[in-house]
Structures are given as structure tokens and as C-alpha cells.
Amino acid sequence: MTRSSDTIFALSSGRVPSGVAVVRASGPRAREAGLALAGLVPPPRVARYVALREPGTGDLLDRGLILFFPGPRSATGEDTLELHLHGGPAVVTAVLRTLVKLPGFRPAAAGEFTRRAHANGKMDLAEVEGLADLIVAESEAQRRQALAQSSGALSRAVAGWRERLIRALALVEATIDFSDEGDVPDDLTGPARAEAAALCTELTTALADADRGERVRDGFIIAIAGPPNAGKSTLLNRLAGREAAIVSPVPGTTRDVLEVHLHLAGQAVTLVDTAGLRETDDLVEAEGVRRARVRAEGSDLVLWLSDDGTAPPTDMPAPLRVRTKADVTGAEGEEDEIVISAQTGAGINTLIAEMERRLGEMGGGEPALVTRERQRHALSDALYELDAALAIQTHDEDLMAEHLRLAARALDQVVGRVDVEDVLESLFRTFCIGK
């Protein structure tokens, strides 16, 4: 059972062995770790080089740096102490084993430092989600987007929207409370409606970009499709830079979906090799064809490969057409085709450039504000309530005010002011110990 009154500790840097290991302690007794192991606590935010010793015996554990960050001016909002050690496994184990013996100290649970930062008002829910995304970011676009989120880009936008919404609500409530007293202007709902309409426009713009944010966060899917023996697996291997797929002149060799992860245009991409699309009586191959169609339909971009100009299915949305085996056929291709030879590499750079261009159109530009389905749903709820408030006829200010209050509550859900515990539990399960 975890208690917020405990002082928690953990290795907060990367996996050992490493050049330097950082052990962090946070909680009401964090100072005592410095006194017990180093015999001192340095001034706030000042590093001191000290000998760390086992309390009682005086045995030397290591020599390193000690820093102290008193709450609330710390990452967690609590007193926090850091020990910067040599990154050997035995050194780290010895220090952790010593800390666990101190009264009131216990090992931190996964994500517990961040949970305390949230509880102490250092981070809101959107920022915690951004930090979770930053920890697992693989591509440059994911890093930039997660960093913007964890730095409060969405939180600041929501705070501004909420402030304006509360101002509009106050105007409507003033109309309700004081309209008969002559202390307020006759038409306060007009400015309130204007503000609500402006908010609707801004939320609509943010939501229109949500799909891009979620795509960048999750990574893009590019499916390689085409008839059997069109060179799909050969192209996959060429783009992956390794022999990821079996290549055979026998049509129907690829029967299942094969995935390779790579980066293009700063984006995380899953490249999917699919079974050749054709009619077949082979039950296993037929299942592969079915799966290929499903993956192609759910992908962000389809590369349609053919060595003879076979057209893609009419229900396939705007594929990038690629004429393969140029080294064998010598074909020049149609105007909308890119001609390549995956064997010799001819045309591959042109193909990659076009793939990167299309990925840039789908996921480029400044980081999106909305990056998760939960955020999108909450903002959609706020937009719905604002639209409902604007639809209210005059002289029904009570109902209009209620819709504005519900819109404010929906905005609160974005940053975790309400209904937050279940989301936090799910989030912190994805965090590492020490974060």
C-alpha cells in the first residue's frame, strides 16, 4: 500500500551500468537521506561532492554529488534529494539497500514521482500525458509534439478558453440575478453569445487538427500492396535496410502481414508488407489476402506495386502507384507512377522523397494541441455544450447558463480538474520506476 506521507526513492536515470546514476528521494524525510549517508544537506540547488557512507558502520558506499530541492520549489512539490553516483550496478544496489533501511523510506511505485507532482499542482493531466508520450517518443515529430504537450501547450490553451467561458457565464448569470434591479445593462447575453461563438470557432479548429496529433503520436502506417510477385517484399527489405521478408519468385509466398518500423521525414512509420491481392482457392493464402485488404484500408498511405501497370482496386483510396522491376522490364511507367528497381536501387530515392512529402502533408507543421482520444472527446463535449447554449432562444438564460457550466466542466476534464483518477491509474501503469 502506498502512502503520500512516505518518503519514496528510486533510480531515476537510465538502466545501469552507465556513466552516472541518479537516485532520487522525495517526501517529508528526504533531507534525512543526506544527513544519514553524507552527514550534510547542501544549500538548496547547490551540488556538493561528498563521500556516501553506510549509517552506523561508516563503510564507504561511493563518492558523488548531492543536491537538495526544498518543496514546493521542486519537481514533485515536495522536499527532494538527489544523489549522483557512479553508474555501476553494485554501487546503485548498495545505495538503494541503504535507503530502504531508513525510517519512513520506501521504494517508489511506477510513476509515483509524477503522481506526486500532479497531486501537488506541478503538472496537470494533459502535461502528465505529454510526459508519458515523451518517454516513449521514437521520432523527431513525436518528441516535438510530446514536449509541447508536457510543457503545457494544451493546458495554456484550455486555461484561456475556460477563463473566457467563465466570463461569458458570469454575464448570463448577472442577467438572471440582477435583471430586475436595474443594476446591469439590459443585454448582457449578447456579449456572452459572441464570446461563446468565438470559442466554438477556436475549439472547432483545434479538433480539426486532432487527427493529425493522434497520427503523429501513434505513428503512421504505410501498406505495401499489389498483385502477387510484384516485388513487395523486396521493396520492404530495401526500405528497411535488412532482410525482413522472405523473397521468392513463387507467387503467394507472403501469406501474412509483416511489419517493419522505421523513420521517414521525422515521423514514426510502420511499413506493412501484405499478401498479393488475387483470387485464390488456397484457404491460407485467401486469409492473407483478406488481411491485406483490411490493413490497406486502415493505413495512412498505400504503395500500390505492379510490374506490368495493373491498376489498383477502385475502392483503394488514392494509392501511390509504383512500377517495379525496372531493371527487368525497362518500363517507363505511367505519368502517375514512380518507376523503381528494388534490386538495383534505381528510383528508390525518388520514391522515398514522395513518401516523405506525403507524410509531411499529413503530419508536418507545428505540434498539434490535441494528441489523445480522451482529450478529443472532452473538447468535443465542450463544443457540443457551447453549440447548445447558442441555440437557446432569448429569455431562457437559466438553460443557457447550464450549458455553459457543462462546457466548463468538459474543459476541466481535459486537464484533469475532474474525473481524473481512472485516467491517472491507467497512465502511471505505463511509467517506469523512478519517473
UniProtKB/Swiss-Prot annotation:
<feature type="binding site">
    <location>
        <begin position="248"/>
        <end position="254"/>
    </location>
    <ligand>
        <name>GTP</name>
    </ligand>
</feature>
<feature type="binding site">
    <location>
        <position position="248"/>
    </location>
    <ligand>
        <name>K(+)</name>
    </ligand>
</feature>
<dbReference type="GO" id="GO:0002098">
    <property type="term" value="P:tRNA wobble uridine modification"/>
</dbReference>
<feature type="binding site">
    <location>
        <position position="233"/>
    </location>
    <ligand>
        <name>Mg(2+)</name>
    </ligand>
</feature>
<dbReference type="GO" id="GO:0005525">
    <property type="term" value="F:GTP binding"/>
</dbReference>
<dbReference type="InterPro" id="IPR005225">
    <property type="entry name" value="Small_GTP-bd"/>
</dbReference>
<dbReference type="InterPro" id="IPR027266">
    <property type="entry name" value="TrmE/GcvT_dom1"/>
</dbReference>
<dbReference type="GO" id="GO:0046872">
    <property type="term" value="F:metal ion binding"/>
</dbReference>
<feature type="binding site">
    <location>
        <position position="253"/>
    </location>
    <ligand>
        <name>K(+)</name>
    </ligand>
</feature>
<dbReference type="Pfam" id="PF01926">
    <property type="entry name" value="MMR_HSR1"/>
</dbReference>
<keyword id="KW-0547">Nucleotide-binding</keyword>
<dbReference type="InterPro" id="IPR004520">
    <property type="entry name" value="GTPase_MnmE"/>
</dbReference>
<feature type="binding site">
    <location>
        <position position="254"/>
    </location>
    <ligand>
        <name>Mg(2+)</name>
    </ligand>
</feature>
<dbReference type="InterPro" id="IPR018948">
    <property type="entry name" value="GTP-bd_TrmE_N"/>
</dbReference>
<feature type="binding site">
    <location>
        <position position="24"/>
    </location>
    <ligand>
        <name>(6S)-5-formyl-5,6,7,8-tetrahydrofolate</name>
    </ligand>
</feature>
<dbReference type="InterPro" id="IPR025867">
    <property type="entry name" value="MnmE_helical"/>
</dbReference>
<keyword id="KW-0460">Magnesium</keyword>
<dbReference type="GO" id="GO:0005737">
    <property type="term" value="C:cytoplasm"/>
</dbReference>
<dbReference type="Pfam" id="PF10396">
    <property type="entry name" value="TrmE_N"/>
</dbReference>
<dbReference type="Pfam" id="PF12631">
    <property type="entry name" value="MnmE_helical"/>
</dbReference>
<keyword id="KW-0630">Potassium</keyword>
<dbReference type="GO" id="GO:0030488">
    <property type="term" value="P:tRNA methylation"/>
</dbReference>
<keyword id="KW-0378">Hydrolase</keyword>
<dbReference type="InterPro" id="IPR006073">
    <property type="entry name" value="GTP-bd"/>
</dbReference>
<feature type="binding site">
    <location>
        <position position="82"/>
    </location>
    <ligand>
        <name>(6S)-5-formyl-5,6,7,8-tetrahydrofolate</name>
    </ligand>
</feature>
<dbReference type="InterPro" id="IPR027368">
    <property type="entry name" value="MnmE_dom2"/>
</dbReference>
<feature type="binding site">
    <location>
        <position position="435"/>
    </location>
    <ligand>
        <name>(6S)-5-formyl-5,6,7,8-tetrahydrofolate</name>
    </ligand>
</feature>
<keyword id="KW-0819">tRNA processing</keyword>
<comment type="subunit">
    <text>Homodimer. Heterotetramer of two MnmE and two MnmG subunits.</text>
</comment>
<keyword id="KW-0479">Metal-binding</keyword>
<keyword id="KW-0342">GTP-binding</keyword>
<comment type="function">
    <text>Exhibits a very high intrinsic GTPase hydrolysis rate. Involved in the addition of a carboxymethylaminomethyl (cmnm) group at the wobble position (U34) of certain tRNAs, forming tRNA-cmnm(5)s(2)U34.</text>
</comment>
<feature type="domain" description="TrmE-type G">
    <location>
        <begin position="219"/>
        <end position="360"/>
    </location>
</feature>
<comment type="similarity">
    <text>Belongs to the TRAFAC class TrmE-Era-EngA-EngB-Septin-like GTPase superfamily. TrmE GTPase family.</text>
</comment>
<keyword id="KW-0963">Cytoplasm</keyword>
<feature type="binding site">
    <location>
        <begin position="273"/>
        <end position="276"/>
    </location>
    <ligand>
        <name>GTP</name>
    </ligand>
</feature>
<feature type="binding site">
    <location>
        <begin position="229"/>
        <end position="234"/>
    </location>
    <ligand>
        <name>GTP</name>
    </ligand>
</feature>
<feature type="binding site">
    <location>
        <position position="229"/>
    </location>
    <ligand>
        <name>K(+)</name>
    </ligand>
</feature>
<feature type="binding site">
    <location>
        <position position="122"/>
    </location>
    <ligand>
        <name>(6S)-5-formyl-5,6,7,8-tetrahydrofolate</name>
    </ligand>
</feature>
<protein>
    <recommendedName>
        <fullName>tRNA modification GTPase MnmE</fullName>
        <ecNumber>3.6.-.-</ecNumber>
    </recommendedName>
</protein>
<dbReference type="InterPro" id="IPR031168">
    <property type="entry name" value="G_TrmE"/>
</dbReference>
<dbReference type="GO" id="GO:0003924">
    <property type="term" value="F:GTPase activity"/>
</dbReference>
